[in-house]
Each structure stands twice: as structure tokens, then as C-alpha cells.
Amino acid sequence: MGKLARKVAMIGAGMCKFGRNFPLKRNPDMWVEAWIDAVNKVDNGIEPKDIDACYVGNYSSDLFNHQGHLGPQMANLVGLTPKPAPRFEGACASSGVALRQAIIAVASGIHDIIAVSGVECMTQLPTTGVTDTLATASDDLFEYPAGATFPGLYAAIASAHFHKYGTTAEDLMRVGIKNHENGKENPFAQMQQSIPEIMASKVKRYEQQGRDVPDWKDEIDFLKSSANPMIASPLRLFDCSLVTDGAACIFIAAGDVAKKYTDTPIWIAGTGQGSASLSLHDRDEITGFIATREAAKQAYQMSGLGPKDIQIAEVHDCFTIAEILAQEDLGFYQKGKAVEAIKNGESHRNGSLPINTSGGLKSKGHPVGATGAAMAVEIFKQMRGIAERNRQVKFDVERALTHNLGGSGGTCVVTVYQK
């Protein structure tokens, strides 16, 4: 894996509030909000005339919103037409792919500054429609005709990990508890409640309805109860990410140009992308993702860094088991050992390797086409020391990583950042 031909930096990043925003807000509205937020994060200001292209990451506005050809639409809204405005699709890794392609384009010298857009409006469809649309990112020859859904596929992955490494349902629950605690501190998150707060709200509602009030001993007891129904064994409701509308915006600039816009650019140290068979049955094993390992290998080689150098990471927790697999595939922990990071607090906000300080997909939300870009927004904030509320980590972040996975691991993008 070669080096970037010239230095590339992130000079601004922003997002809209994630949530069930439709019908009050659609893709155009959310993208403009994210754009404005990102512009406001560029220290010395930036204007459309400064930007050479708009790279749009979007999974399936065609099916969610009956709107294709999204690139020019997003570019036109912020004054970037007639400049290039391609759209990139990689399932849930769509804006991760767009970000990586923008990095490569700037490094090549073709462009000096690119605006990266990640956007998805999912709640225009009912739950059944969302499930069916997401299923188009799985294998259509074998999995889809058999009735496979992503909860079912990740349940199979979780079951395999349980069997091989002794991982338990409680281990997954601890991932969700941690990420809800982080999401509580993120004003842009869809679900800004910790698990204890969710428990308290349910108790209050039961009392108002005159129902028997459950006597949950703690968060784990609550998550084992009928209040957290089984979706696809062993995955329960709170193991699954949210159905979300949202948008995020990143400004990527060449190194010699970046200093015009900020004195504190966040440098792109390395980036990589991997792939795998869409169908689980075609893979050698399913207790990890080969696409993640390949993308990480490329990003580490390009950056000259390794897993031990990373201080903070945003990883793709579309299901709680996915966060555990990501930590192992990225080399942070040996196979079967990542659950210890949850138990002993290493991956908590004040731990030695904070994971998903944004709340992750579990709490921040998962508007699939915007997820990868939103991860970069969180890293930008943490490295700048501007994360809101009580979410800012207690140390100066010099090196960070984002991990954006598509589907059941068919696509992965890993990017490493450095001050």
C-alpha cells in the first residue's frame, strides 16, 4: 500500500441532528443543516467558490424516497453546481467510501478541496419497507429468497462468536449500555437517554397506566426482560441500531491549502477499503470480517501506525456484536478478548481506548448513507477538543480511527487521522 501523493487534511465537519426527521425534514433539508454546521466549524471560513467538487455518499434514496441522481441535487442546494457531484454507494459504508475517494482525489492533485456529503432519509417508508430496502444490500441469490434480514444475519454471526469464544448475551448488553451512556451526552444523537433513564421512563409510564411496575435490579436485568424483546436470537431490540434520518458534511483539503482555512487541520494519515462475499455461507468464517482486516491493513500501512497507536475510535456498531468484532478485526484485541474491554471499562469514555464516544449507531442513530461521514464528525470534534456536553475525552487525542462497514461485512472503509 503506497502513501498519499500529497498531504490531505480535514478542515471542517458538521452534521444535522439525527432522528426520525421525516416529514418535517427530508434529504435536502438535512444536508443544508449539515453543510451550515460544517462551514461554521472551518476556523477561517469557507465558501462554495473555494470547493472543487461534492462527493455524495448515499445508500438508496431511490428506494427510500423515490429520488435518484442525488449528487447534483445535493451540490445545487449549496451552490456547488456545475462542479463534479458523483454519488457513491457501499451500503452502510456509502459515505465512508465517498470520504475515501475524496481523500484519494485530493491526494492525486485533481482537486484541492472537496465537500463530502453523507445523507439518508429512511423513515419515509414504514418499518417493513425499511427492512426490505436494507435487504437489497444482502445476497439476492441465496439469502434474500430464504428470508434473511440483517438482524437474522448478525444473529448468526453472534451465535458463531458465542460458540467459538464463549461470548454471552450479557457481553452484548454491556456494549449497548456504554453507547447509550455516550449518546446521552450527544445533542445530535437520535436517542439521548441512558439505559437507566429509559428504565425510569418505562416505570413512570407503567404507573400512569395502572400496570404492575417491574422490579428491575439493574440495567442487565432490564435488558433480559420482556421490555427488551428478542428480535433474532440472541439479538434483542437494544442490540439493534436505530432507523434514522440524517446528514453529515466533511471538508477535505490538500495540505498546502488547508492552512489557509485553519491553523489546526486534522491530517489524514491513512485510508483503506476491503470487500467480501455478500453471502455469509461463501465466507471461510463468520466470527470476524475479512473486509475490515483488509481495510485496516491498508490504512495502517499507509499511515505507518498500528492498532496500539490509536487512542480513540468510532466503529460500526450496527448491532452490538459488530462493535466487538470490529475491535478484534482492527487489531485492538485478540479474537475473543474484546468483551473484556467492555467489562473492565477500557472502551468507555474515560477508558484507555474510548470506542464510540458519539453513542455509536446504537444511540446516535444509523442513517445508513450518512453514518461514515458522521463518524468523521465525531473524530473531528474529539481531536479538536470541542465535543459537546460531557462527551469530550480527558486526554489530548493525537491519533484516531473510523471504521465504516457495509451490509453484513461486504464493504469496509477504515481511515486513520493524526494531528
Name what the model sees in each region.
Residues 2, 43-45, 65, 80-286, ...:
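Acyl-thioester C-C bond-transforming condensing/cleaving domain
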